[in-house]
A protein has these predicted regions:
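Hydrophobic/anchoring residues in structured secondary elements
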Residues: 70, 114-117
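Metal-dependent phosphoesterases centered on the DNase I-like endonuclease/exonuclease/phosphatase
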Residues: 1-99
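Short helix-loop capping/hinge motifs at secondary-structure junctions, enriched
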Residues: 108-111
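A residue-level signal for conserved active-site and pocket-lining positions in enzyme catalytic cores
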Residues: 22, 68, 103, 126, ...
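Short acidic, gly/pro-rich beta-turn/loop elements at beta-sheet edges
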Residues: 31, 113, 125
Length: 137
């Protein structure tokens, strides 16, 4: 994972960008339903969370990206989940994790206006997240 940072730094020197998709890491305790019991599980391991923190940290040690969903919804928990295990009744009981992200350079993140985690139709164990940005192409 550490090898990804030089690529992001080079990209930031060229242009603004959005990195979005399934990162497979729940960054903070509010990003999953049962954080206490998942501290030793992949997706919430300390080293994974540290990598994510570094991804969001500005300065020489980090990539300085912005978690756009958290910018728009800083305290949201249960409605923020984008993944549910296929075991048990995880989806029905909303025992989920927030593993999917829109990460953006600060200039683009500042243009984010609204977000939506689409749960109307279940396509897979993940729900897509969309963000509306205030700019035209």
């Amino acid at each position: 994972l550490a090898g990804f940072f030089p690529h992001l730094e080079a990209l930031k020197k060229e242009r603004e960008f959005v990195l979005c998709g399934d990162i497979n890491i729940a960054h903070q305790q509010i990003d999953l339903k049962n954080w206490r019991s998942n501290q030793k599980n992949s997706g919430f391991l300390p080293e994974e969370r540290a990598w994510m923190t570094r991804l969001l940290h500005a300065g020489t040690e980090g990539a300085g990206l912005v978690d756009v969903y958290r910018k728009l919804q800083p305290d949201t928990t249960d409605s923020a989940y984008t993944w549910w295990s296929n075991r048990g009744q995880a989806y029905a009981n909303n025992v989920g994790w927030r593993l999917d992200y829109h990460l953006a350079t600060p200039a683009i993140a500042a243009l984010a206006r609204t977000e939506e985690i689409y749960k109307t139709i279940k396509f897979s164990d993940h729900a897509p997240i969309t963000v509306d940005y205030d700019f035209t192409l």
